[in-house]
Amino acid sequence: MTEPKLATTHVVGEPTFEGLARFIERNNITKIFVMVGAGISVAAGIPDFRSPHTGLYAKLSRYNLNSPEDAFSLPLLRQQPSVFYNILMDMDLWPGKYCPTTVHHFISLLAKKGMLLCCCTQNIDGLERACGIPESLLVEAHGSFSSASCVDCHAKYDINMARAETRAGKVPHCNQCGGIVKPDVVFFGENLPEAFFNVAGLIEETELLLILGTSLQVHPFADLALMVPSDVPRVLFNLERVGGRMFRFPTDRTPNFRASSYRLSTGNGNGSKISSGDSSNSSSVDGYDQFTLAENDETGVLRDIFFPGDCQVSVRSFAQALGFGEQLDASVREGREIFERTRRREKVVEG
């Protein structure tokens, strides 16, 4: 077998913040698709799921669950609702509790500048909404705490009442059928919202993919990164590398040998769609280690970029390269001031 040659060039030119900014300006990029995960909310004080010792899963050992995912499953909710609601009291992700981060404001700024095609988030904390990302450009793939409903009859339940009962240590029950009420977040094994599958049509229009603060271990959300056209740059902002050989970054020295065969089997890079028939939320620890999707290996051209480290810091540097670092700083300050004023008013009312 003839080995593919090592990539020598990159579709954006120079794979740096400045090079990426020049690529955006040179090509008049206005259709940026953003995928975000729990890592962008850690700076707000919300733990992510998988970090050792500090992540949410690491804190679930006292419940003696078979797996951490069981805490977010309907069978356990029905059998032992107190487990989920005790976790809910610890998380306290109801609207207004946490302040959006620099990354949230960066995405909102992209929207204001007409550069955001879609923000698809795994997060259930609602901080994308809180920082002003328009609902028309936002897909909450795993739901949010902005509403609640009965798990049996699906009747809507007043979100403020659900929050008050939860904070009082009670399990909310439906006024109509008596079933257990939960926030409208997607549990493992539940179907994702229809809005998630509608974004597949946007994938074909994507001109740049930004991936921020996600482990890419939950499907079908992670599959979105496979669906953008094969010449579209994919940029990962994360503490550590994820995605296995889904990506090939400029620092990688080992070429991928199975790209063509896997691409043919998935239809990757041709606007392929995620089927709503496979719509349940599932978790995987493989991180795509067994796959390889570096489509441009054969041509000697790369399209992936990895900016390791704190995504808040990296995004601030990226915004600076784009020429709106000061606007981002101002947006963060204003957002913090509004958040603190609102919190003070709420404390006065509660007091």
UniProtKB/Swiss-Prot annotation:
In this chain the Deacetylase sirtuin-type domain maps to: 10-325
**Predominant location category:** nucleus
UniProt-listed InterPro entries: DHS-like_NAD/FAD-binding_dom, NAD-dep_sirtuin_deacylases, Sirtuin, Sirtuin_cat_small_dom_sf, Sirtuin_class_I, Ssirtuin_cat_dom
A Gene Ontology biological process noted in the UniProt record is: DNA repair
Which residues make up the binding site for Zn(2+)?
C150, C153, C174, C177
What reactions does this protein catalyze? N(6)-acetyl-L-lysyl-[protein] + NAD(+) + H2O = 2''-O-acetyl-ADP-D-ribose + nicotinamide + L-lysyl-[protein]
Top-level taxon of the source organism = Eukaryota
EC class: transferase
Give start-end positions of Low complexity composition bias: 265-284
UniProtKB keywords: Chromosome, Metal-binding, NAD, Nucleus, Repressor, Telomere, Transcription, Transcription regulation, Transferase, Zinc
- How is the co-factor bound, per the entry? Binds 1 zinc ion per subunit.
Q: Report TM segments.
A: none
- Pfam families noted in UniProt: SIR2
Active-site residues? Answer: H142
A GO cellular component annotation here is:
cytosol
E.C. no: 2.3.1.286
Q: Name one GO molecular function term.
A: NAD+ binding
Disulfide feature: none
What the entry lists under Gene3D superfamilies is as follows: SIR2/SIRT2 'Small Domain, TPP-binding domain
Q: What does this protein do?
A: NAD-dependent protein deacetylase, which is involved in repression of RNA polymerase I-mediated expression immediately adjacent to telomeres. It is however not involved in antigenic variation and subtelomeric variant surface glycoprotein (VSG) gene silencing. Plays a role in DNA damage response. Also has ADP-ribosylation activity in vitro.
What this protein is called in its record is NAD-dependent protein deacetylase SIR2rp1
Name of the gene this protein is made from: SIR2rp1
